Amino acid sequence: MDAQLLQANKRLLRRAANVRQRYKMLATESFVADIKQILLRFIQKPNVIIMYISVLVLFAAHIDSNTHDILDDLAAQFPNNTFIEWAKSNFFRICGALVFIPVIIDTEEKHRNYLALVIFVFLMGFPQRSIMEYFIYSISFHVYAKAKHPVTRIFIIGAAVFSCVMFGIFTNEQLRKLYAELPKVPTHPVAVNRVEKVANRASRVSTEGTVNFG
C-alpha cells in the first residue's frame, strides 16, 4: 500500500512538473500561460501552503466567539504591552503581513528589500483590508515580480487598480480629484508664438478684406 501511494505521489508530481514546463514554454507567447505557470510553481511550494494554512487557522480562531486567540492570551499575560495592544487592533494587518511573507521570500534577492519596503508601505499606509483582499494583492505582487510576458505586468496593474476601486480603497470621487490635480501638459512657447502669429495674420487679412469690400 505504501509503495502504491508513493508511486501515485510521484506520478502527480511528474504530471505537475510537465504542466508547469509546458506553461513555461508558452509564457513568452501568451500572458495567460505566463500567469498560469507562475501560480502553479508558487502554490506547489511547501512554505507557501504552510503559511496560508497558518493564516487560515489564525483567522478561524479569531472569529470564533467561544475561543480566545493567541493575541487575547498574550494581552491577558502582558496587559501593559503596547505592541500586543497594537496587534489586537491591527489583526488583519498582521494576517496581511503573514500572507505577503511567501511573496517576499520567493522573489529575487536583489529585489527583496525593495519589494518588502513597498509591501510595508502598502500595509501601513492604507486602512485595514480583509484577508481575501490581502491574498489577492499578494498574488498580484508575486505575478508582477515574476512575469515574463510584457502584457502580464500591464494586465496586473489594470487588475490591481480595478480591485482597489471595487474594494473601496479608491473611490470614484477620489479618482476624479486625483485626475483634476494632475499637472497639465504645458504647450511649447515656440508653438504658442506660431499659433498667435497665424491667428494675428488671419485676423489682419480678414479685416483688410472687409475694409476693401466695404
Swiss-Prot record:
<feature type="transmembrane region" description="Helical">
    <location>
        <begin position="84"/>
        <end position="104"/>
    </location>
</feature>
<dbReference type="GO" id="GO:0033644">
    <property type="term" value="C:host cell membrane"/>
</dbReference>
<keyword id="KW-1043">Host membrane</keyword>
<dbReference type="InterPro" id="IPR032441">
    <property type="entry name" value="SP24"/>
</dbReference>
<dbReference type="GO" id="GO:0016020">
    <property type="term" value="C:membrane"/>
</dbReference>
<feature type="transmembrane region" description="Helical">
    <location>
        <begin position="116"/>
        <end position="136"/>
    </location>
</feature>
<feature type="transmembrane region" description="Helical">
    <location>
        <begin position="43"/>
        <end position="63"/>
    </location>
</feature>
<keyword id="KW-0472">Membrane</keyword>
<keyword id="KW-0812">Transmembrane</keyword>
<keyword id="KW-1133">Transmembrane helix</keyword>
<feature type="transmembrane region" description="Helical">
    <location>
        <begin position="150"/>
        <end position="170"/>
    </location>
</feature>
<dbReference type="Pfam" id="PF16504">
    <property type="entry name" value="SP24"/>
</dbReference>
<protein>
    <recommendedName>
        <fullName>Uncharacterized protein p24</fullName>
    </recommendedName>
</protein>
